[in-house]
Amino acid sequence: MEIIPAIDLQNGEAVRLYKGDYDKKTVYSKNPLEIAQKFEQMEAKYLHLVDLDGAKLGQTRNLEIVRKIKDQTNLKIEIGGGIRNLDTVSLYLEQIGVERVILGTAAAEKPDFLKELLVKYGLSRIVVGVDIREGFVSTSGWLEKTTLPYLSFLKDLEKIGVKTVIVTDISKDGTLTGPNFELYDEISKETSLDVIVSGGVKDSSDIQRAADSDFYGIIVGKAYYEGKINLEKEFNHANKKNYPLS
């Protein structure tokens, strides 16, 4: 299992939202590149980036920061937020060279487009972000709740050929109250998808719980920024246990 640190980008800054609310924002740094470099020094392998402006508006607004992080670190980058057409996917994967892109809204609204990307780029480079609010999938930066029950949607993704999903319980995100492990356990039981846990991580016990359940990965954001988790210690422990993320 891989521990994946997160940087959420808005207006060129590193921020965190509370339960996906754009009006409840905390700014942690005006220099996201410095944070990424610090993660690299801690021996992180992957970095989870979210373009919050992109997620809300459907346009890439933090492109140059993503490019700088890719050029000035050796971190393997996954990026999500506003990736809704082939040009944007191509920009990230082919021009900037990130390792994988995360589709959310596009995956829910355009399954044929998702299939096209899986064929063109392969299963390892296309990840689907499944954001859940009150049992249903949410889109457009968590602002729109669909009528798609999350488990049905996940099973549809599996049929299409998706391999990896990042699942977020929006009610947990940014709360430091612990992930909704019942949700993740259910998904693992009902599908064969590789599940990355996202939202609500509060301390190292959550990382251990995810590892014990053999989840594919866990994303850590606010718990690090608020000093609740010593990521350097966690990376060292994970590297010794040899949890690879292919």
From Swiss-Prot:
GO terms for cellular component: cytoplasm. The active site is at 8 (proton acceptor), 131 (proton donor). Transmembrane segments: none annotated. GO terms for biological process: L-histidine biosynthetic process; L-tryptophan biosynthetic process. The keyword Amino-acid biosynthesis applies. It comes from the Bacteria. Its EC number is 5.3.1.16. InterPro entries: Aldolase_TIM (IPR013785), His_biosynth (IPR006062), HisA_bact_arch (IPR006063), Isoase_HisA-like (IPR044524), Isoase_HisA-like_bact (IPR023016), RibuloseP-bd_barrel (IPR011060). NCBIfam families: 1-(5-phosphoribosyl)-5-[(5-phosphoribosylamino)methylideneamino]imidazole-4-carboxamide isomerase. Belongs to the HisA/HisF family. This is 1-(5-phosphoribosyl)-5-[(5-phosphoribosylamino)methylideneamino] imidazole-4-carboxamide isomerase. The gene is hisA.
